């Protein structure tokens, strides 16, 4: 019986039929002949095509990966394809048949060397089964191609494509474009292949390293091909730009551009310093371990018990726990284990691993020399054409541009900018060396070689790319964008220090463009705040960007004090639309009107002066501090520049911005202590140690002082600080937050001339046009529910009345006020159906107009968003059903209006309409009176002449009265009729007025009735005064009238008494003419008396009573009203002089006066004059 092994039981991962077909084709392709050289088979070209079909069908369409594994197992690449290319390489261009075979072999090499990728969406079992084997096979392909000794395979691939490259662009066929593409893709695959991290290799990594690839590219003149293609992009080559971009990316990623252009001597010194620093770190680490390391005497071990504060005992083993209690506690903490639950994170696929550009790559001396020469030639000849063409392709989003190309574009832009800056510094150092014959020229100092990534178009594309990456959380893309932006800022900084004035002007212009956009400032702040474990490379990029941006912005803001930034904010834009005018008179209210003000929230752009302190305050917060703290935790792996970057930020937070409270957290304090005191802290011999030690000592002093001022800080050290906590710890009290009350929208009304049903139709039409049918349906549902409820109540009320009538005895009479005492139906509360509806009931003035028109009432303050809406008791079920019918009618049959107007044109702002109406009535009255003033006959009395009485003080400025109510609109006939009535009234008053200048002797014109009335009033006044005087004597008052008057005036001045004398109630000396005047003043908008509140009127009336009681002998009031020329238009008052001895009152029109509650103008001077005259008689 034959012996079997486990291999016999193992299942073949490849389908045997596929394996047989592929192996038979490879066998027929050719092999090694008797002479030791490779011999092609008779049907070699057909075999190559069949193998390509199998590869395309099996691995492309069926997605199995079986064919690629069979070809790897059969050693197709090294044993056949490379031998075929080496055999036909000398005559590949001349012989057409050989050229076809070479192209077929190259077409087969490209998919075999294409980096293996596992698509997480379309991956199958075969991908995971064959993936590691194929990856290792591809590394073998790369090693064979780079180390193949019988031919230069890469150079042969370029020779195959040379005939197609020589054809002009317009004359090339698709086959020529395909040959050029597969040759460049073959070069790209060789540069792209790297050893896998998931599978071990049995070959030397140096044979497939970056240095070996660069040396091979140099030996086989691939760099010259890349320079030729890149410099001719846009002229001879178009679709090949992205392939060249990928080749450059995989050649240059991870290479330090600073070291690349260093002099050999300086580079050796730098490498020696790095080695020294590493040895110092290792020595410090070993020294820290040696402090607690076991000695040769502890061969039996040690175990101790530690008694804690809670009387619990803990056992610790090891000699390192002996000595201090702190060492025991630290040992106890180290032995604690916490199995933190790990969430299944996103698995990093092969593409992301290949696209990683933060891992440094070491180069050999020869590789560094070759790549440096290539980069210098590329910057001189090919950088601008290639990157200009790529930027345009990315902007247009052409089909050949993929997502990864934008990331590679910005990373390479930053890399080449850094290389150019390093090259310029080296050239300046050479020029400064007297022993070096190198001399700088104007071209060497100019930055024109990298101009295509320093223009405005690139900045716009970069900003858009960074914002998109941040929104989509594509952190690798954002990392590349941040590196590019940082390097642009550093390049601009070096341009500003250039010796050429043109470069300085360009740098000033670029800085102005970058710092002008406030969105750029906000984006940098948000990127810094949003760090959440994206990796060390991302953390390094974001901290470097924030550091460089903040320092350059601070320097630029100091140089440009009047720096303006473009700010985008939410604003309210008011648009006014003027309706068409019709009719002859365009000034009439009904003919010209403005439509309602439409307020729309939109992004508005405005410029404002830049305040760096404001930006720095926004830049420094708890999230940004956490980002730098996370970066500082890698302090043992950071170089000097990175440590200084962290130190500058913490120094700004603690001392410049005086926000050291943000750093008062237990983990941050422990980190600072560990960095300085260890274990595993900073090396005291490192260049950054001194600065850090000084900062930590000052900061801890500040913390101790702050804890003494605010003991609450001890508790807050356990938590991150929010703004409210920061304010409390700084000031000792909480911030007072004042909430602004929301303002109600402007009230609307339908223009006059329409009935209520038509007005409802207008409101319904507006809501329908604004796509607010849901609000209309909600109002209708509320009305339907209210109508049913009101109808049920009315039915119950009728039943109650019928029952009461049946229980009443037959002979009992019904009381007359039964109807008045009958109960009213309860008001119905209007409830919103959602939170949006509740807000609309307050903010949507169109909806409020409809609710008001159908009968809803609003209870509460005007600006109260929570005010209640009700359906009043006055509305019966019939009224509500009528409103429902109107809503249904106008919803499906909206009314139409004349001249093509819409319902929006028929509504207006109620307050604006009231103001316009008031101004128009005033102007009409003034014009009519001015026109008719000439026609009025005042007889022998001259109107408007000033009295001889001297004024009491400086005349107060008159102000127009602000009315509370809205005046009623008047038509033309009514206005004419009222104006005519006013003119007649004024003529009658002027005819009856008598000035003291024209008063005759009383003996000539004797009127007994008037004299009797006058003496009767005087007697009544005298009696009232004596009664008041007696009451004051009875109460024991010793104050004089003058002191009481002064007290009254002082009290009124404290309560902000109005400037004009108050209204007097039922004065015995009030003329009928004066009352008429005041009624007219109250009804006429041109009246100038200020309106009074109820509190002022009550206070002034009590004050007047005191004055009338206590000052009977005062001749005139201190604050009397002085007449002016303008007062004659509303009614002339009697002119009175202090020397007058005889006064006659005109009160013939008492019967014509009508009572009115409106406050009238007081006549303080007349009362004083009458008192003096009566006493003299």
Swiss-Prot record:
Residues 586-597, 923-934, 1002-1011, 1071-1080, 1145-1155 have a biased composition (Acidic residues). Its main location: nucleus. It comes from the Eukaryota. Residues 332-353, 576-598, 802-830, 893-1012, 1028-1177 are annotated as: Disordered. Keywords: Cell cycle, DNA damage, DNA repair, DNA replication inhibitor, Meiosis, Nucleus. Residues 1054-1066 have a biased composition (Basic residues). This is Topoisomerase 1-associated factor 1.
């Amino acid at each position: 019986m034959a012996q079997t092994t486990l291999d016999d039981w193992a299942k073949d991962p490849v389908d045997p039929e596929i394996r047989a077909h592929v192996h038979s084709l490879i066998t027929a392709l050719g092999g090694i002949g008797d002479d030791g050289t490779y011999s092609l088979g008779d049907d070699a070209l057909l075999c190559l095509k069949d193998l390509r079909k199998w590869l395309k069908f099996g691995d492309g369409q069926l997605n199995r990966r079986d064919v690629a594994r069979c070809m790897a197992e059969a050693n197709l690449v090294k044993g056949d394809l490379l031998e075929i290319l080496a055999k036909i390489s000398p005559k590949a261009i001349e012989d057409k048949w050989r050229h076809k075979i070479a192209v077929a072999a190259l077409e087969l090499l490209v998919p075999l060397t294409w980096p293996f990728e596992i698509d997480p969406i379309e991956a199958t079992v075969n991908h995971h089964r064959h993936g590691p084997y194929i990856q290792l096979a591809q590394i073998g392909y790369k090693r064979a191609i780079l180390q193949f000794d019988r031919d230069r395979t890469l150079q042969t691939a370029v020779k195959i494509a040379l005939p197609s490259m020589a054809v002009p662009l317009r004359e090339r066929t698709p086959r020529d474009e395909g040959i050029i593409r597969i040759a460049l893709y073959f070069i790209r695959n060789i540069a792209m292949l790297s050893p896998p991290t998931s599978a071990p290799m049995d070959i030397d990594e140096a044979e497939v390293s970056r240095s070996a690839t660069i040396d091979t590219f140099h030996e086989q003149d691939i760099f010259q091909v890349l320079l030729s293609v890149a410099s001719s992009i846009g002229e001879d080559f178009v679709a090949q730009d992205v392939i060249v971009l990928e080749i450059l990316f995989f050649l240059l990623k991870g290479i330090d551009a600073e070291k690349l252009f260093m002099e050999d001597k300086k580079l050796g010194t730098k490498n020696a310093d790095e080695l020294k620093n590493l040895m110092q770190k290792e020595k410090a680490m070993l020294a820290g371990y040696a402090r607690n390391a076991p000695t040769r005497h502890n061969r039996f071990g040690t175990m101790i018990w530690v008694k804690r504060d809670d009387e619990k005992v803990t056992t610790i083993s090891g000699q390192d726990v002996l000595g201090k209690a702190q060492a025991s506690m630290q040992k106890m903490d180290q032995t604690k284990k916490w199995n933190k639950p790990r969430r299944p994170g996103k698995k990093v696929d092969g593409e992301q691993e290949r696209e990683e550009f933060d891992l440094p790559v070491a180069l050999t001396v020869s590789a560094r020399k070759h790549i440096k020469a290539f980069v210098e030639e590329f910057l001189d000849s090919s950088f601008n054409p290639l990157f200009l063409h790529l930027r345009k392709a990315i902007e247009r989003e052409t089909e050949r541009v993929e997502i990864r190309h934008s990331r590679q574009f910005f990373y390479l832009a930053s890399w080449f900018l850094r290389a150019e800056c390093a090259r310029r510094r080296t050239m300046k150092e050479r020029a400064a060396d007297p022993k070096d014959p190198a001399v700088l020229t104007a071209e060497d100092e100019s930055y024109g070689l990298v101009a295509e990534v320093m223009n405005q178009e690139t900045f716009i594309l970069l900003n858009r790319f960074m914002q998109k990456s941040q929104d989509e959380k594509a952190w690798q893309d954002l990392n590349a964008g941040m590196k590019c932006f940082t390097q642009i800022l550093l390049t601009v900084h070096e341009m500003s220090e250039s010796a050429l004035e043109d470069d300085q002007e360009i740098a000033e212009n670029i800085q102005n463009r970058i710092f002008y956009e406030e969105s750029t400032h906000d984006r940098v702040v948000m990127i810094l705040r949003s760090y959440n474990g994206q990796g060390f490379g991302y953390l390094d990029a974001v901290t470097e960007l924030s550091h460089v941006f903040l320092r350059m912005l601070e320097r630029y803001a100091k140089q440009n004090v009047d720096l303006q930034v473009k700010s985008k904010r939410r604003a309210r834009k008011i648009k006014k639309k003027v309706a068409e005018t019709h009719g002859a008179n365009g000034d009439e209210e009904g003919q010209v009107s403005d439509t309602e003000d439409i307020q729309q929230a939109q992004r508005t752009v405005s410029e404002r002066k830049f305040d760096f302190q404001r930006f720095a305050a926004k830049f420094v917060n708890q999230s940004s501090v956490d980002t730098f703290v996370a970066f500082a935790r890698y302090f043992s792996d950071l170089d000097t520049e990175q440590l200084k970057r962290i130190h500058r930020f913490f120094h700004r937070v603690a001392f410049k911005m005086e926000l050291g409270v943000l750093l008062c957290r237990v983990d941050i304090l422990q980190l600072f202590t560990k960095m300085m005191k260890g274990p595993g802290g900073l090396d005291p011999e490192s260049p950054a140690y001194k600065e850090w030690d000084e900062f930590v000592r000052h900061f801890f002093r500040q913390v101790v002082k702050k804890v003494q001022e605010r003991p609450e800080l001890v508790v807050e050290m356990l938590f991150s600080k929010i703004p409210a906590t920061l304010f409390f710890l700084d000031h000792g009290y909480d911030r007072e937050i004042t909430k602004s009350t929301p303002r109600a929208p402007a009230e609307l009304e339908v223009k006059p001339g329409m009935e209520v049903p038509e007005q409802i139709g207008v409101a319904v039409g507006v809501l329908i046009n604004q796509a607010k049918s849901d609000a209309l349906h909600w109002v209708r549902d509320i009305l339907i529910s209210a109508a049913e409820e009101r109808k049920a109540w009315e039915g119950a009320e009728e039943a109650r009345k019928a029952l009461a009538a049946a229980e009443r005895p037959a002979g009992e009479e019904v009381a007359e006020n039964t109807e008045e005492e009958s109960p009213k139906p309860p008001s119905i509360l209007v409830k919103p159906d959602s939170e949006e509806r509740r807000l609309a009931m307050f903010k949507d003035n169109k909806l409020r107009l409809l609710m008001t028109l159908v009968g809803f009432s609003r209870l509460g303050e005007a600006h109260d968003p929570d005010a209640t809406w009700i359906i009043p008791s006055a509305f019966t079920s019939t009224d509500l059903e009528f409103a429902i019918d109107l809503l249904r009618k106008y919803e499906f049959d909206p009314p139409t209006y004349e001249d093509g107007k819409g319902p929006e044109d028929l509504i207006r702002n109620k307050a604006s309409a009231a103001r316009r109406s008031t101004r128009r009535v005033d102007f009409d009255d003034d014009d009519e009176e001015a026109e008719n003033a000439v026609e009025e006959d005042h007889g022998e009395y001259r109107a408007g002449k000033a009295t001889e009485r001297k004024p009491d003080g400086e005349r107060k400025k008159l102000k127009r009265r602000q009315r509370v109510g809205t005046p009623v609109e008047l038509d033309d006939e009514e206005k004419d009729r009222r104006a005519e009535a006013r003119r007649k009234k004024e003529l009658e008053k002027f005819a009856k007025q008598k000035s003291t200048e024209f008063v005759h002797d009383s003996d000539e014109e004797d009127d007994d009735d008037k004299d009797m009335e006058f003496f009767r009033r005087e007697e009544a006044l005298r009696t009232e005064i004596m009664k008041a005087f007696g009451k004051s004597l009875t109460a024991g008052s010793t104050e004089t009238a003058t002191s009481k008057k002064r007290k009254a005036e002082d009290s009124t001045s404290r309560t902000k008494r109005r400037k004009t004398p108050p209204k007097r109630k039922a004065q015995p000396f009030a003329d009928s003419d004066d009352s008429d005047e005041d009624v007219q003043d109250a009804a006429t908008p041109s009246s100038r008396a200020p309106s009074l509140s109820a509190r002022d009127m009550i206070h002034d009336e009590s004050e007047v009573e005191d004055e009338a009681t206590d000052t009977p002998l005062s001749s005139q009031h201190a604050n009397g009203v002085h007449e002016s020329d303008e007062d004659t238009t509303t009614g002339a008052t009697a002119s009175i002089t202090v020397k007058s001895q005889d006064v006659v009152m005109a009160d013939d029109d008492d019967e014509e006066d009508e009572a009115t509650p409106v406050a009238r103008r007081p006549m303080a001077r007349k009362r004083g004059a009458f008192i003096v005259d009566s006493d003299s008689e």
